[in-house]
Amino acid sequence: MRYKGSVYRPPSEAYSLIVQVTYWCSHNTCAFCSMYKEKHFAIRPLEEVLEDFRIARGVYRRVDRVFLADGDALVRKANELYTILDTIRELFPECERVTSYASPASIRIRTEEELRTLRDKGLTMVYMGLESGCDDVLKRMRKGHMSAEIVEMGRKVRRCGMALSVTAITGLGGPELLERHAIETAEAFNAMNPEYIGMLTLMVEPETPLYDWVRDGSFQLLTQPQVLEETRLLMEHLDSPGSVFRMNHASNYLVLKGTLNRDKEAMLRTIDAAEHDLSRLRPEEWRGL
């Protein structure tokens, strides 16, 4: 496929056909994020997008999944998204799922009728970053949205019958906001009740404001015991029946997998075991993004 710059995808889209629908991220100011820094956000010409799908049809015998990249595909005009989804359905009748990243801003500009039409045309799920349910964390990290707005946009997606996968980042509040970050993030997840909850653990990337803050001492990273403390607080306060919980990203020290609320106690026991034996944690040198 023809790609411009670095292309990022959720771990679950490893075997998907990935086509860039936009270039880079429409927000691109989060203090912790090093992605999509090559150039400014741009809408990819529609004919180029459609041509990529035609090329893929000639190359791949079967395409079960499609991921619409880059960081905010949903920001395109609705009729162009319809055309893209119609083309996918026409060229790949075997395709079972189409997904994309979405920001609170791009969800806000879509009417519920448009979201339902996107769902009916095959957009089965969107990935949205919550990062934290604590407004003080979101402000410092320059997310551009407060928790209530992110929650409302997540609920909007759910109302329209589309699946929702939401991620947050352990350690994003530092030691100072550890408790609020954990509890308020859990409360935000509970309010959205998404199909999927994904937790990453903060990693500091060069050429980000967060990197500079860590170097000058204005931001403190959590220790491994503090990461476990925060994770336990989050899990204790999660009440999102049916949500699939995944904390298995390469950035995480501890792997947790289960379905809420059914597996909550088992995951708490796993955290407790790790707190008593830190050798259960992923070594620092094995972590990655």
Regions found by a protein language model. Name each.
Residues 1-13, 187-289:
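Auxiliary Fe-S-binding modules of radical SAM enzymes
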Residues 5-48:
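Canonical Radical SAM [4Fe-4S] cluster-binding loop centered on the CxxxCxxC motif
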Residues 17-19, 64-66, 96-100, 126-128, ...:
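Hydrophobic faces of well-ordered beta-strands that scaffold small-molecule active sites
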Residues 25, 33, 49, 68, ...:
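Conserved, mostly hydrophobic/aromatic
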Residues 49, 81, 111, 150-151, ...:
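Aromatic/hydrophobic pocket-lining residues that form the small-molecule binding cavity
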Residues 57-160, 239-240:
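Conserved SAM/AdoMet-binding glycine-rich loop
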Residues 105, 133-137, 157-181, 200-206, ...:
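Conserved strand-turn element in the central/C-terminal portion of the radical SAM core barrel
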Residues 110-115, 173-191:
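Catalytic cores of alpha/beta
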